[in-house]
Amino acid sequence: MAKKDYKAMAAGIITVLPFASVSLPLLLVFLAGFGMKAGLFPMHVWLPEAHPAAPSHVSALMSGVMIKTGVYGILRVTAALGEQPLLHTAGVILLAAGVVTGLWGVILAAMQNDVKRLLAYSSIENVGVILIGIGIAALGKASGNQFVALAGIAGALLHTANHSFFKPLLFFGAGNILSATHTTSLDSLGGLGRHMPLTALLFLAGTAAICALPPLNGFVSELLIYLGLFDGIASGSDTLASAAALTALALIGGVVVLAFTKLYGTVFLGSPRTHEVAEASEADNHRIAAMALPLAGILFVGLFPRAAVAAVTRAADFFLRTPADAADWLLSPSLAAAGRTAWLLAAVVALLLWLRRRLLRGRRIARGPTWGCGFTSPNEKMQYTGESFSEGLQSIATSLTQNSGEGSPVPKSEIFPGAHSFDVGHRDRIGRLFSAWWVELLRRINARVMRLRTGKINHYVLFALAFLALVFLLSVLNLI
């Protein structure tokens, strides 16, 4: 099929769908269905359970590609609304859903003590960021603000692509860690930077990208969303919604840095906490190559933001359904400055690494234990754990989680305590309530439906005839 035929087919999708008179309940049904696929709060409960159970390369595919089909569906439905008044309502709903999903995902991510569960909740947070972009784009389109609409949708589309680069890299890294140590528990890992230097370096690039630090790709897409939110405030249209989303996006960014500083520091820095971790070795070349390939995309988007935005503006034009002055947007001072800043930072980092290597050349580097404030016999048990690293956030957000602890208590009569253990876990309180309610609802529906299972063929023929009669009636009334 020719390229132009694909464009015609894409345009025809909107033409044939009955969205011209779509109602709010129908819109909510579409958003709920696609939102469940994307991991939208509170329908995200399946995602943190699926990623730890799946092999790491499957988790990379699920997070990088599969959940994006839900985002694609939401984008299609929003684009199909055209210029009707419901578009503004859809924008507000998407903006609110994105804020709640992003905050919920990142707070729960920062509390996790398992590498893959942390990355899974981070995927929920990134879906929230994408929905913030789509929401502000819908508000800009509804109010006629071309800049806000284009910045929001370009940022959302680019962040969708960016997440498909850095999240598979991180999941591949988690697979390397699991293969080398046979665990993904943060409280069992540590010091892997010495044993797995290439994995540590590539994983560091992925954490910097997901934290939206320049000169990497996450910075560019979130910059576009920020520009749309700032312009939405400055233009006076939907000021309150834009300001609230801007505040939430900044808060999300701060907690992301906390979560991934905890992840990288606990896993790769410090000392090994177990014998298996101390005996870990670097992954083979194929596994390293699997991490390096997404890094190429991360660097390309970060260092060439104008080219990356050019790749998504065609889709942005399709969303806007009106001719967009993409050339002026690509040449905007903010985006050009982002490119210059990225190259400047890359040059500074390269220069510092070169100076460090040159200054240390030929010198003996002494290694010793971390200074313990006068204590001369520190051990690996005295390091920060994943639990202690995020204790401050846990004390603030304790109502969001269902905490559990299992261990053996220390008797008061035991003057010199022996070996004891205590395991702490954090579960998603709202997610567990929602899943319990959903399972109970399905159980009751199934119990009622099972009454129709009589085992008599004449009853089943009657059901089929009744269904056909219902379809005929709805067709006559022009309801389907």
Where are these regions (language model features)?
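Hydrophobic alpha-helical membrane-embedded segments
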Residues: K167, G254-F260, A346-R363, Q402-E406
